[in-house]
Amino acid sequence: MKDVKIMSLFRVLNESSTSCKDPIFGTMNYKHNWNKSETFTLLGKKYKLEVAVQAYNGKPINSEEQKSYKYIKENWPALQKPIARSLFKFAKECDQKVYTEKDLSKIVKPRIILFQLNGNAYLLFDCAWDLENDISVQIYPDIKLVNQQCFL
């Protein structure tokens, strides 16, 4: 009976420490970082992306991360074209034949929006022509192509 009480207490403590209701992000779960799934439209398609927020040892999401998430949510329609331009430019530099968003959506697939402690945010993509490295676009505070290796 004592073991059952201990296991119940552990389960309650474990469950309460692995999720939070952030006022900006909403309900988030913790496993190495705060995360949730969310649907975003990009390149004319809807994608279910992981929203990942860095945190150390389950510490709360900070104000810089909240600020960048709020900015991205409020400005997502305006951010899509510059993101697509960055991807087009990179694809053409890699000799990929892309002419439309539909072409681009066949060779890159967004997976994760990563929010770093300093508020920088990155959109990480799977990339058909470079499976080892993939690609990322910084989407806050600036939009630019970056090397995904720095996140691994």
Go through the PLM ranges and name each one:
Residues 1-40, 46, 97-152:
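Acidic, proline/glycine-rich low-complexity IDRs
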Residues 52-102:
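Long, charged/polar, surface-exposed segments that mediate recognition or autoinhibition
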